[in-house]
């Protein structure tokens, strides 16, 4: 299986603009620029897309890992925060904030252990060479 995304960029780094499109067309010539990446411009940016991909992948991996333990997942809400070091121009880490509804028969310690395993086995986690941290709110 292959997934495809395309990017087009025109102009200098600070004044130029670009568009990102995905095979599914969920992103279809979606605007990105220096301002959307490093300021508050309208559009997306590569780091935001990584965060979205990681949050989605982790949530699915957690659901699958819970099912592997014969546990049905309740609501899973994940926020991924990508840390960008502007001096080094590199991503230095990603933090996953997980909020999940109480699942009958699973205590918080077991759930946290399962979530940590899902973090490790998530396909996007495996693709990234940065520290990935996790905090869990199990209510």
Predicted regions and their residues:
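Extended beta-strand/beta-hairpin segments
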Residues: 1-52, 59-139
């Amino acid at each position: 299986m292959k997934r495809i995304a395309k990017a087009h960029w025109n102009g200098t780094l600070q004044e130029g603009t670009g568009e990102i499109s995905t095979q599914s067309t969920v992103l279809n010539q979606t605007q990105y620029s220096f301002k959307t990446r490093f300021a508050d411009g309208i559009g997306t940016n590569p780091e935001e897309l990584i965060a979205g991909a990681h949050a989605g992948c982790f949530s699915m991996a957690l659901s699958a890992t819970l099912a592997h333990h014969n546990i049905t997942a309740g609501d899973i809400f994940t926020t991924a925060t990508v840390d960008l070091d502007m001096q080094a121009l590199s991503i230095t880490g990603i933090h996953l904030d997980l909020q999940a509804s109480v699942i009958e028969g699973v205590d918080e310690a077991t759930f946290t252990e399962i979530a940590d395993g899902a973090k490790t086995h998530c396909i996007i986690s495996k693709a990234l060479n940065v520290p990935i941290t996790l905090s869990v709110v199990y209510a």
